[in-house]
UniProtKB/Swiss-Prot annotation:
Residues 33-106 form the CSD domain. PANTHER family: PROTEIN LIN-28 (PTHR46109), PROTEIN LIN-28 HOMOLOG A (PTHR46109:SF2). Belongs to the lin-28 family. It comes from the Eukaryota. Residues 182-195 have a biased composition (Acidic residues). One of its GO terms (cellular component) is nucleus. This is Protein lin-28 homolog A. The gene is lin28a. Keywords: Cytoplasm, Endoplasmic reticulum, Metal-binding, Nucleus, Repeat, RNA-binding, RNA-mediated gene silencing, Zinc, Zinc-finger. RNA-binding protein that inhibits processing of pre-let-7 miRNAs and regulates translation of mRNAs that control developmental timing, pluripotency and metabolism. Seems to recognize a common structural G-quartet (G4) feature in its miRNA and mRNA targets. 'Translational enhancer' that drives specific mRNAs to polysomes and increases the efficiency of protein synthesis. Its association with the translational machinery and target mRNAs results in an increased number of initiation events per molecule of mRNA and, indirectly, in mRNA stabilization. InterPro entries: CSD, CSP_DNA-bd, Lin-28_RNA-binding, Lin-28A-like_Znf-CCHC_2, NA-bd_OB-fold, Znf_CCHC, Znf_CCHC_sf.
Length: 195
């Protein structure tokens, strides 16, 4: 039984197939210029899509989607894009479609980015209702993180040291008023404080 060498297989291909493979390989290595806007960007996953409206300075009849990864964004700090943000970019064709290789703002400026940040585990469930420190009343931390020594006990509703929240007259009077008139969501979340 004879064996067939690799030379015979590749040498046996018609020239047109070899040329087609070379053209496909060179097409993937070409870098193109484009501009458009951010279609969407997932800040938690770090990727999204751009809507290309111009290729090599020429308007496109129909917009084309181009994949973008956060590692390709030209900007300081946390890398992300805002929906609708104008961008200029270079891109290449890959086996998966069009992929950006570098993304900037107009004129090569840094990208603006999204105001959104991914939620960090532990902070998702925390501070949803305006939680405050039970020790000092601060809004920026909880009692276990408080830098002050333990404070005297006081009402968590009105901050008075004369009673606790269960016996708070301010809370009782507010509850009576609430039954009489409807309130907005803002009033519901922020209790009035007395000194």
């Amino acid at each position: 039984m004879g064996s067939v060498s690799n030379q015979e297989i590749t040498g046996g291909l018609p020239k047109s197939l070899d040329e087609t493979a070379d053209i496909h390989k060179s097409d993937e290595s070409l870098i193109f210029q484009g501009s458009g806007v951010c279609k969407w960007f997932n800040v938690r996953m770090g990727f999204g899509f751009l809507t290309m409206t111009k290729k090599e300075g020429t308007d496109l009849e129909t917009p084309v989607d181009v994949f973008v990864h956060q590692s390709k964004l030209h900007m300081e700090g946390f890398r992300s894009l805002k929906e609708g943000e104008s961008v200029e970019f270079t891109f290449k064709k890959s086996s998966k479609g069009l992929e950006s290789t570098r993304v900037t703002g107009p004129g090569g400026a840094p990208c603006i980015g999204s105001e959104r940040r991914p939620k960090v585990k532990g902070q998702q469930k925390r501070r949803q209702k305006g939680d405050r420190c039970y020790n000092c009343g601060g809004l920026d931390h909880h009692a276990k993180e408080c830098k002050l020594p333990p404070q005297p006990k006081k009402c968590h509703f009105c901050q008075s040291p004369n009673h606790m929240v269960a016996q708070c007259p301010a809370k009782a009077s507010q509850a009576a008023n609430l039954e009489e008139q409807p309130i907005s969501e803002e009033q519901e979340l922020i209790p009035e404080t007395m000194e």
